[in-house]
Structure formats: C-alpha cells, structure tokens
Amino acid sequence: MNEMLRAIEQEQLKNEVPNFGPGDTVKVHVRIIEGKRERIQVFEGVVLKRQGGGARETFTVRKMSFNVGVERTFPVHSPKIEKIEVTRKGKVRRAKLNYLRGRVGKAAKIKEARNK
C-alpha cells in the first residue's frame, strides 16, 4: 500500500520547480479562471515559509498592496501554478519569517544574499 501511495504522489510532482526558500523574492504566475475566460495573474512577494514535503508541500508569499499586507499560500506542485520565478535571493537566518508581519517599511527589508 505504501509503495502505491508513493507512486501516485510521484506522478503529481512537478519537475521544473526552482530552488527557493524563505527570504527570497519570487514571482508566482497563477492561472485564474473568471467565468469562461482564463488568464495568468502574477503574485510577487517575499517567501515567508516553505513547509511540508512531497505533493503536499506549500509556501507562503507576502506582499504589500496599497499599504496592506497580503499573504497567499500556494501548493508548490499545484497545476494552477504556471511558473515560479526567483527575482532575488534573500539572506535570512530563520526558516519561518513570521516576524515580518509586524514590521513596516525599511524594517521589513531583507538583505540580498551575495553569490559565492
């Protein structure tokens, strides 16, 4: 039974998921259906956390929209996600950046990671 579940879960995984983590700025291209029309909506923000594993893995992205914080949680391997672009690598020391919720302006900025 366990091998069967693992095989089904393996089919659900996407191959082209980029390497990203908390602190990175990403653009998530989401497929949205409005009535009979289908379009791509881009959600750009900072990754707060990445949790779970396999087909159930999710990540949370936070952005500021008209001075209001907007957070959205996406399944990594969702068929509704067209693609994920990493725009900026961030340098952080935590796996979960929940402390950013209480910060505004310059205090909410994350340093950019330097390439080695």
From Swiss-Prot:
Molecular function GO terms recorded: structural constituent of ribosome
Keyword Transmembrane on entry: no
GO BP annotations listed: translation
A Gene Ontology cellular-component term: cytosolic large ribosomal subunit
InterPro entries in alphabetical order: Ribosomal_bL19, Ribosomal_bL19_sf, Translation_prot_SH3-like_sf
Entry keyword Cytoplasm: no
Function: This protein is located at the 30S-50S ribosomal subunit interface and may play a role in the structure and function of the aminoacyl-tRNA binding site.
PANTHER family: LARGE RIBOSOMAL SUBUNIT PROTEIN BL19M (PTHR15680:SF9), RIBOSOMAL PROTEIN L19 (PTHR15680)
Family, similarity comment: Belongs to the bacterial ribosomal protein bL19 family.
UniProt protein name: Large ribosomal subunit protein bL19
Organism of this sequence: Clostridioides difficile (strain 630)
